[in-house]
Amino acid sequence: MEDVLSTHFDRIEKALSTLVDSIAAYNPSPQAAIDLVAADDQLSHGLDQLSRHQANHARILTLRAQVEALEEQKKSSVTALATLRHELHATPATSFPADTRPVRFDELLQYAKNISQYTVPPTYRERAPEAASDKDRDKDDAASSGVNTPAHAPAQPDSDAPKDRDNADNKPAEVTAEEEEWLEKLQKSQIAWYPWPSEEKIRIGNLSKLMYWQARGKDVDDFDIPAHEEAQRKGLAGVVEAPPEPEPVAEPVQAQAPRPARPAQPQATFDMFDDLDD
């Protein structure tokens, strides 16, 4: 590209020199002016070509950088795949026994739902005991009242410092607001809480039913316990019927003896004016 531009510059320089010499000799040459204009056009075209060349060169450098980056990415990907393949071949294969029973996902989710109410969250922490703080409060109350205070208190040994350090190291983890609310509700309910179900709940659960039917010789894998219980309930409902209500019995009406008639009382008559008739 430099040679092409040098040629254009030499041509325009010669055309310009010829035109200047003709003007200086008082004999201007029109052809020299035309050659100068043509040399200028060729120089402009060469400069445009140089601009495109520089843009293409920058584009080539960018593409080379991208090629190098992609090459490095390809090498790292191949290395990772080789490492993963080596780890997969080194991983021991899991061999399941022949008597393995497949478990459906809905059955597994139902089992997790049943035991979720008897489990605690992994972040559960019991509240720190308050016995030490109560003792310190009692000591402070006794000191403020002055009761049983000796005239000259003996110097306390420095053996409490390691204990305080141990207590600081053994501090329980902080309890979140949600856990604190749950603990407050549990404390207010005044109900003994255990992280496992009670014996009564275990006896009425599905595991107890499985043990019961297995002890009676049923194959729990093929035996449908809910369907059998439903059939038993329907059978009992058909056999046991409500006793018919007793029909009311008409009791004989006893004939009452006629009451004795009362003697007729004499009717009172008005006899005030009987004396006047006489």
Swiss-Prot record:
Residues 57-88 form a coiled coil. GO terms for biological process: regulation of transcription by RNA polymerase II. Residues 120-181, 240-278 are annotated as: Disordered. It holds the Pfam family Med4. Residues 250-268 have a biased composition (Low complexity). Residues 124-142, 160-172 have a biased composition (Basic and acidic residues). Keywords: Activator, Coiled coil, Nucleus, Transcription, Transcription regulation. It is found in: Nucleus. One of its GO terms (molecular function) is transcription coregulator activity. Belongs to the Mediator complex subunit 4 family. Component of the Mediator complex, a coactivator involved in the regulated transcription of nearly all RNA polymerase II-dependent genes. Mediator functions as a bridge to convey information from gene-specific regulatory proteins to the basal RNA polymerase II transcription machinery. Mediator is recruited to promoters by direct interactions with regulatory proteins and serves as a scaffold for the assembly of a functional preinitiation complex with RNA polymerase II and the general transcription factors. Component of the Mediator complex. This is Mediator of RNA polymerase II transcription subunit 4. The lineage of its organism: Eukaryota, Fungi, Dikarya, Ascomycota, Pezizomycotina.
